[in-house]
Design a protein with these regions (language model features):
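Asp-box/WD-like beta-propeller blade repeats and closely related beta-sheet repeat scaffolds
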Residues: 1-4
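Beta-propeller domain segments
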Residues: 15-180, 188
Length: 194
């Protein structure tokens, strides 16, 4: 997934089933990458601040399988949806120099074999806004802005593959106020939303 914010390109890179590689800040899998639009490296990326050992283009680590990414026109934050393993899908924010914890954390899910991965969350790692256990196979995300459903402005609309649903999440200060299923199972797996 790609997002442009303030002349920077943010790129997601899944961990491709390699697990702990998402904790390796010298490799791209399991990370969020941030570069300038001309392909050069921003001099305010984490490597040039307090993460001296990180690759210069890495902005955040510890994601498993990012599915959607969207820039909010309301708070200028980048929001992300991510597949867990067997459970542990989540919706959260992209944050400078932080770590979502895959595969130290399991976000509430388990390995496909049924064995435990790790805790849902623990201090020192980025906490998601919303987790789904069991997995709904989150996919695309957008932050709604428009006149058709004015009361939805600022809410996240998230699609689902496995659950075949469109969900609306009202949230504030990184906390869910409510989640509503707009529809489910009507049109099959939903990959994208605009």
């Amino acid at each position: 997934r790609l997002v442009i914010k303030e002349n920077h390109l943010y790129i997601t890179a899944g961990e491709r089933g390699q697990g702990m590689i998402a904790q390796d800040f010298t490799k791209h899998p399991g990370s969020i990458i941030r570069i300038n639009l001309d392909g050069s490296i921003p001099k305010d990326n984490p490597k040039f601040k307090d993460k001296k050992d990180w690759l210069p283009e890495i902005y955040q680590i510890g994601v498993r399988n990012p599915q959607g990414m969207a820039l909010s026109p309301f708070d200028n934050k980048i929001y992300l949806s991510n597949h867990g393993a067997k459970g542990g899908d989540w919706f959260g924010t992209v944050n400078f120099g932080e770590n979502y914890g895959w595969k130290i954390l399991g976000w509430g899910g388990t390995n496909y074999s049924g064995t435990k991965i790790g805790p849902k969350w623990k201090p020192g790692f980025t906490k998601a806004i919303k987790y789904w256990v069991p997995s709904i196979a989150v996919s695309a995300i957008t932050i709604y802005k428009g006149d058709t459903f004015k009361e939805w402005n600022g809410d996240a609309l998230i699609t689902s593959l496995k659950d075949q649903s469109l969900r609306k999440i009202k949230f504030k200060d990184d906390k869910v106020i409510n989640e509503k299923i707009i529809f489910k199972g009507n049109i099959g797996r939903i990959r994208d939303i605009k």
